[in-house]
Structures are given as C-alpha cells and as structure tokens.
Swiss-Prot record:
Alphabetized SUPFAM superfamilies for the sequence: P-loop containing nucleoside triphosphate hydrolases
Protein's cellular compartments: Cytoplasm
Name of protein: ATP-dependent protease ATPase subunit HslU
Biological classification of the source: Bacteria, Pseudomonadati, Pseudomonadota, Gammaproteobacteria, Oceanospirillales
UniProt source species: Alcanivorax borkumensis (strain ATCC 700651 / DSM 11573 / NCIMB 13689 / SK2)
Chief site of localization: cytoplasm
Amino acid sequence: MASLTPKDIVSELNRHIVGQDAAKRAVALALRTRWRRMQLPEEMRAEVAPKNILMIGPTGVGKTEIARRLAKLADAPFIKVEATKFTEVGYVGRDVESIIRDLMEVAIKLLRDKEIARVGSQADDAAEERILDALLPPARTDDSSANTDNSTRQIFRKKLREGELDDKEIDVDVASNPAGIDIMAPPGMEEMTSQLQQMFSKMGNNQQRKSQKLKVREAYRLIRDEEAARFVNEDELKVQAIDAVENSGIVFIDEIDKVAKRGEGGGTDVSREGVQRDLLPLIEGSTVSTKYGMVKTDHILFIASGAFHLSRPSDLIPELQGRLPIRVELSPLSPDDFQRILTEPKCSLTEQYKALLETEGLNLEITDDCIRRIAEVAWQVNERTENIGARRLHTVLEKLLEEISFDADSLATQYHDKPLVLDAEAVDRYLGELADDEDLSRYIL
C-alpha cells in the first residue's frame, strides 16, 4: 500500500472503469489517507477520522465496480451490502451490526488464506512425507536395509512429484469431519445459531481420526490442507483480523437512497428512517460484539451509494449526511463512453465473448463500426426505456451473439481458420428491428 499513490490508484482503476474521474479521485484519496494515518504518532492517529463517501449517480455507471476494484487494490477486508436488506433493531430482519460481523468473517478468511499460502511449502513437505509413509512399509533398522529403503523412498518421491502415482489408492489417516448440525436461522439470529453450531460441533467432535482409502491425488490435497491448518495460529489470526477490520476495513452500502424518507408522509417506516438511525453509531464509531472479539468501527471506511431517482441526498436524516462528508456525483454514460467500455478495459466485454467462442474453435472478429453501432443501440434503448447504464451492453451483446453462440461448433467447422466478421450491418440485421420497436426493446433489450 505504501507504494500506491493516489495517481497509481486512479491509473489502476482506469484499467477497468471508463470515465467517472471525480469518483476515482475521491476513493483514491480516501484510501491513501488511511495509509497516511497509519504513519502518524498514535495519539494523533486516533483523532483522524476516515473520509466516508456518498456516491450519487444513476444505475450502471460504475459505482459498485469502483468499490469492488478498490477492495482488490487495497487487499483489505471488504464487504458490499444493500441498505434495503436491514431493519431497525427490534423488528424481524437483519440488524446493521451484522455488517461488521460479516466483515470479520471476510477478514478471517482473507488472513487465513494468506497464512496458508505462506506455510504452503512446509505443508507440501509434510504431506509428501505422509503419503510416502502410506505408500512404503516402515523403514528397517540395520544400515544396509536403511540405505536400500532410503533409495526406494527417493524413487517413489520422484514418481509422486511427477504425478505417476496420482491414481494409486492408499490408506491414510485423516481427521474425521462429523456431520454438522444445521440450524435454520431466522433473520437477525445468525450470530446465535452460529454459536450453537460451534457448541454442538465441539461436543461431538474430539478430533477423532479415521482411516480412508483414497487416490493419492485426493489424499495429498486433504493431508496438505490438514498440515497447513496445523501451522496456522488461530488465536493470533483473530487478533490480526480484528486489527485489519478496525484499520483497513471497507464497507460499501449500496441502495442507500432506498432508505431515504421521501416527502413529508407521516408514520415511521421500519426499513427506512430506523435503518438510517441504526447506521449512525456504526459509521460514527462504536463497538460491535463478534464471536472473535469486540470490534471498534471508528476507522472503518464507509462508502454509500445510490441512484437517488425518487429521492434526494437531502432526504437522508441530517446526522447521516454529516457522517458522509465527501459527496461525488457520477455522470450518466454517453454513446462514446459505451464504445470505450466495449474496448478499453482489461478483459472487456468483447474480449470475453471472443475468448468464450475461441474455446469452440471459432475466431470472432468485431469491427470498429460494429462496436460503434452496438454502443449507439444500447444508448438509444436506454434513452427510450429504463436507463440501466452499461448493463444494457450485456443485454445487447447477448442478443446479438445469441445465434452465433448457439451454432458455434458448426460455424467453427464452416469457417475453419477464417474469422467470422461482425460489422455494423450484422448489428442492424440482428438487432435493427428490436432496437427501432420501442415495445419490443422494452421487453427484449
């Protein structure tokens, strides 16, 4: 993270997301500020609040994608939730504190995977020795026999590494995994049922081992996982996970506009103002109890987003507005943006479809005028019907390539080594009537 300046972060986001420079700069600064905070003396570090962000923009313009790419870039615990899934404390449904509990689970998995990767070579060596022990009889004690046994072991080790023994069956002792007790959790009670499951599993599981007959390939995988788990210090892992969540955690709250109170209608709404009020202490800073320990939310970065079609940011309660100090407006996408989305990002949509059809032996070539026409059709349909942003490109491309994809195997034989060329005329042929007919495009595109 130390080497990632705001310019580097924006540059990396540009590889995957077209436009929306203001939003990219805002999240890049928020991420860099977290690193800067960690360099401060401890007394001042505690006073620096995270730069929470409110993203405002229509659907399909890149709000969620920016947050998703940012999390990968930061290599930090990240969770995306929808505000509409939560209810006020005391009502049936999930309460907002479950966001932090879920974030802790993400952090535990992230750090455990890293730790297992770190001790991978040790686990590989231990698994290899156990497989060889199962393949060969116990070593003899006299010197001449011991040398012979060692030579045989090295021969088998070479065969094992080269995969020659993968399909051979052996008897191995592995930890038994007794069938767990599944408890259907009512909304909001996931934490309690998780604790009950842990309690029952500990009561019924004394780490018993059993012998299984497995192929070497499967046995190696099981034993490697078992050996890797032995090298992981679970207590230390919990401490590191709590620290990672408290100082590096990112929570992305989507559909925040759906819990904004519209107009001056009377009465309380369980899934609106109550959820906003419950979010306040979480965003401002509170302590949440999880099964791994107490987690402080003071320095978790919160990014909220919403389209705000039927409501405005000012419809959020004032206290919540104050806790999302940085506001970024994302602009609607133009036909030129659509054209860039189809070609510029790494693993763009057109590259994905080409790669998928290449697996059938069909070489697809999409011309520039074809891409221009696809972008125009997608933009026109958005203008005439519901504007769903760049997601419309998925629908248009899927419809355009439907027949080609269905007949890909026969087309591959027909075209041999020649590419199948798609141009603007092909777009008009496949989509022209649908795009021009508003009623049809409303239901099909």
